[in-house]
């Protein structure tokens, strides 16, 4: 049994970081262009946002869950291609919350993977407020999650307003209230 998490986007890349191994955990680094078989024009893309790909093994069963989708499809798809991650292997999609830097690459992923994703693939979101329009601190448009676009791509939308299980392996929490110190 085990869990592997690949970071596809996280605001940062450091091509000179070295792998780390400790008991029960191994951290591999990706980002440079000196990998065998990868042309020098190809490299890891860093940008604002978050995307992770979790692979869990339970007995002889393996499940793959993509958590968040970064800010742009260009970076998400580029990084997926860089490490050879096939969208057809995804068993579930999870969105942590409705900010553009977490869902921005989703529709591009769905468009690029049309006809390749598993039938009935589910997207777990925390609730209806994930679809709210948001504004930046300066009052600009921060985007909103496109429900019609998601449904048109054949994705099964799961409003996880209570804890849920994604792909039979991953627990998705319900909404976590935001509290400020003010």
Map each language-model feature to its residues.
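Short internal beta-strands
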Residues: 94, 120-131
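Zn-dependent metallo-beta-lactamase
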Residues: 1-62, 167, 172-182
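Divalent metal-coordination and catalytic microenvironments
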Residues: 5, 54, 68, 80, ...
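Pre-active-site segment of Zn-dependent metallo-hydrolases
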Residues: 43-48, 56-92, 108, 115
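Active-site environment of divalent metal-dependent phosphoester hydrolases
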Residues: 15, 74, 99-103, 130-133, ...
């Amino acid at each position: 049994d085990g869990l592997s998490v690949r970071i596809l986007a996280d605001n940062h890349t450091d091509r000179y970081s070295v792998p780390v191994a400790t008991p029960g955990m191994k951290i591999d680094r990706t980002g440079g262009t000196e990998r065998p078989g990868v042309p020098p024009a190809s490299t890891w893309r860093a940008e604002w946002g978050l995307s992770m790909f979790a692979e869990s093994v339970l007995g002889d069963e393996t499940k793959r869950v993509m958590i968040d989708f970064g800010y742009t499809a260009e970076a998400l798809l580029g990084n997926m291609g860089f490490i050879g991650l096939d969208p057809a292997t995804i068993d579930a999609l999870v969105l942590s919350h409705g900010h553009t830097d977490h869902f921005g690459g989703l529709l591009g992923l769905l468009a690029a993977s049309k006809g390749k994703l598993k039938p009935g693939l589910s997207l777990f979101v925390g609730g209806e407020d994930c679809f709210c329009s948001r504004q930046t601190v300066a009052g600009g448009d921060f985007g909103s999650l496109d429900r019609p676009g998601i449904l048109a791509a054949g994705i099964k939308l799961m409003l996880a307003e209570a804890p849920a299980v994604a792909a039979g392996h991953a627990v998705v929490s319900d909404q976590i209230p935001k509290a400020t110190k003010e």
